Amino acid sequence: MTMITDSLAVVLQRRDWENPGVTQLNRLAAHPPFASWRNSEEARTNRPSQQLRSLNGEWQFVWFPAPEAVPESWLECDLPVADTVVVPSNWQMHGYDAPIYTNVTYPITVNPPFVPTENPTGYYSLTFNVDESWLQEGQTRIIFDGVNSAFHLWCNGRWVGYGQDSRLPSEFDLSAFLRAGENRLAVMVLRWSDGSYLEDQDMWRMSGIFRDVSLLHKPTTQIRDFHVATRFNDDFSRAVLEAEVQMYGELRDELRVTVSLWQGETQVASGTAPFGGEIIHERGGYADRVTLGLNVENPKLWSAEIPNIYRAVVELHTADGTLIEAEACDVGFREVRIENGLLLLNGKPLLIRGVNRHEHHPLHGQVMDEQTMVQDILLMKQNNFNAVRCSHYPNHPLWYTLCDRYGLYVVDEANIETHGMVPMNRLTDDPRWLPAMSERVTRMVQRDRNHPSVIIWSLGNESGHGANHDALYRWIKSVDPSRPVQYEGGGADTSATDIICPMYARVDEDQLFPAVPKWSIKKWLSLPGETRPLILCEYAHAMGNSLGGFAKYWQAFRQYPRLQGGFVWDWVDQSLIKYDENGNPWSAYGGDFGDTPNDRQFCMNGLVFADRTPHPALTEAKHQQQFFQFRLSGRTIEVTSEYLFRQSDNELLHWTVALDGKPLASSEVPMNVAPQGKQVIELPELPRLESTGQLWLTVHVVQPNATAWSEAGHISAWQQWRLAANLSVTLPSAPHAIPQLTTSETDFCIELDNKRWQFNRQSGFLSQMWIGDEKQLLTPLRDQFTRAPLDNDIGVSEATRIDPNAWVERWKAAGHYQAEAALLQCTADTLADAVLITTAHTWQHQGKTLFISRKTYRIDGSGQMAITVDVEVASDTPHPARIGLTCQLAQVAERVNWLGLGPQENYPDRLTAACFDRWDLPLSDMYTPYVFPSENGLRCGTRELNYGPHQWRGDFQFNISRYSQQQLMETSHRHLLHAEEGTWLNIDGFHMGIGGDDSWSPSVSAEFQLSAGRYHYQLVWCQK
């Protein structure tokens, strides 16, 4: 044990938090989570241990702007100004100090290992009692599961130790410091330390004791560590559970270790042995260790599909069977290896349906509770994810247990990121920083290696490629050869990774960055000498309204076996709740706390909002990742299972044939598909229909029974095909009265029955409509070529730094947002059965023509207005965001009914999950409440739209809400939006894709850009 004076002044003078060679003082060695059961049955059933006591709850807390500001008396007694805070928590969520959101830029001046003198410091204290029996024998430990970023610990006024690494436990022996009766803990937590230079992750920078604190009492002679691993024969019919156990204390001949393996109530295998490891060299072996091998016949294998869990109980006892203590862990029999360029689990090539997940809660910051963790896992499973990357640090210990039991593959990542360094490997190539990096990697492995869900180790994130990475890669491969190691830094294919693991590499497009080119994923596989699998550690940047082009990745994954999937960036929006002056909550992002530097809304890249409400993009991910694929040939549906291990024993295939959303025939068929097998389903012959409508076949895979992660009736997969229908002839309708045209100096007015249409002759726009005496428009019907910018349109542009390559900057520079209409033509003609209005406009900016729009409005005797639009786009202007029409309707109706793709928001490059049907939703559901307002709510492939008294027919895309594009564009946060008068309707003949390969460079694929130059579309507007 390191001994230094207990004096606070001496501790402050030492400044351990500015010395990369001091990562801990008196911290105990890492190990798997312990409970020190004194009853093996309680260990087997994982009952709460009487030897493990939580110290979570109310602690005394004082915040100071620097560590030197606290008086020495704090070590002995609480300060008068002390507040009460809950542990675990981040002190910023209690109003102390400000959270800082920054992606790359360090929140402090870069001068490693030094940190600012003004270093916000939290002083925690807790008074507690200890059971007297704990003082009489054994060892009492205190465990801090997570403290950000570094801390010193005192007990009863005496200094105990020091720890850093915010995301792994720091554990200390308190035995020599405790006394009978009351005891007092004092913890000095520093916001910044030299460790902060290794924790430059894209997240909120927060501080405090944010994970659990507990006391653990272990016997004097104790289990110090244990490690389990599984080995198999070639066909996985026989396995060996290898358990290595290390003890601490007096090594006596009578000591024994028994390892028993349980499946529920049934003991599968057991073995007992004395201590004494195998001979390593001429000096012998480890006297304090023992390795046991338990043979298991026909083990039930673990996978994310079928997470079969056994329980291993490790007992330390005497030769006569007297139990000293027991530890236990869940066990999954599974094998991970790379062979022939493929990542295999139990001999089968994996397809990683993964997502990156930060530990984030909108109210609690970086504090995770079991309910939130389970909620995340259930949502992931329900949306066909099978893997999660712990980005970018080891997670709460409970997370891994839950992943073991529910079934998720885990990439466990070391808490190392130096993204803001120039160059990035400035520290990771520096041997002075190897000890700090080493502790972050080795302790992660030692804590988490018993978890079957952990299938890959990661050396960290965005830290370049340094010699320290190579050393740590070799250490892991030596200590744990059962798992591959991945690391993206330095180009994604360095010597420190077993897997090519790029971030944001595109499917077909090379990105030729200096020194580290980012090849297309297809090309990467074929580089000379390259034989490794490729799994994207990050892809499909889900920031705001995004995930366009996601289907292209999944087409490639299924086409090329060595493209084994990837991890979407990322799971949850990192917005935080603030309250306005009236106590109303609102969602905040970077800069909203006065934090500088900050990266604005770049913290919100989730597939779900911070409260775990899904984004529309989550449905697209679910559909592309679904485990059943379908092929239609005639009346035959071929279903292929992508499950590797699971028989489809809880699935029904439900099919429906519908004409314009009206079901004509349906049935359901039990599914019985073997893993990686096929099932052929024959549909009955359907009558040939003569119809002008659209005939669609839709199949859904439904789970009739509830599972551990889904309710009964859960839909896991679906597909839709348009069927051929006989042509039909629409008979002419009976003659109608002819609309009457009235011309004045200012307007053309057309009247029919109780309806009127007014076209302004000076503007050339439809300026008003009446039904009876009620006006229908608040603004004229005008062309629209812009959208409220998406995050993907904005890229890295901001007020002080403009990216001229960003779509929004190109549109602004070209004048798309400022374009004004100049009338070329506005004429009216009375035809035999209709009135025809013909208009032409140029849309100009600073004398330059950007668009020419020609329209005809044909109003016939039935009251229908057929609108034909032809648009020319100037060859030297950027491709527009949309080509459509917009107006502000006077009515506010409760519901929207449409025949088209839905029900969720969809865009031209993100619509594979949408189905053609007749949908009916509340108006409020047509708006997607992205925290940073933008273009939202589009529905594509629409044939008919009904809203209030109006109906539109044609082939178009639309969005409809209470918010104008102008308001969306000018508003920084969703809570600042106000419902405008009436309803804004946007009807597009064409709409650009949204992109999403990344959010900092234009990523809309060429096929989804509006590059044709000439566009033509039609629609009919009538009143029901």
Curated annotation (Swiss-Prot):
Protein name in UniProt: Beta-galactosidase
**Transition state stabilizer, annotated site positions:** 358, 392
Reactions accelerated catalytically: Hydrolysis of terminal non-reducing beta-D-galactose residues in beta-D-galactosides
Q: What is its EC number?
A: 3.2.1.23
Any one Gene Ontology MF annotation carried by this entry is: carbohydrate binding
| PROSITE patterns reported in the protein's UniProt record | GLYCOSYL_HYDROL_F2_1, GLYCOSYL_HYDROL_F2_2
Report whether tRNA processing shows up as a keyword of the record.
no
BP GO terms, sorted: lactose catabolic process
What detail does the entry give on cofactor binding? Binds 2 magnesium ions per monomer. Binds 1 sodium ion per monomer.
Identify the residues that bind Mg(2+) 1: 417, 419, 462
List the keywords (alphabetical). Glycosidase, Hydrolase, Magnesium, Metal-binding, Sodium
InterPro entries cross-referenced by the UniProt entry = B-gal_small/dom_5, Bact_Beta-galactosidase, Beta-gal/glucu_dom_sf, Gal_mutarotase_sf_dom, Galactose-bd-like_sf, GH-type_carb-bd, Glyco_hydro_2, Glyco_hydro_2_AS
Where, in this chain's numbering, is Na(+) bound?
202, 602, 605
Q: How does it assemble?
A: Homotetramer.
Q: Which residues bind Mg(2+) 2?
A: 598
Q: Which family does it belong to?
A: Belongs to the glycosyl hydrolase 2 family.
User: Which EC class is this protein assigned?
Assistant: hydrolase
The UniProt entry annotates the active site at 462, 538
- Which NCBIfam families does the entry mention? PRK09525.1 (NF007074)
Cofactors per UniProt? Answer: Mg(2+); Na(+)
List residues binding substrate. Answer: 103, 202, 462, 538-541, 605, 1000
Q: Which GO terms describe its cellular component?
A: beta-galactosidase complex
Record keyword Metal-binding present? yes
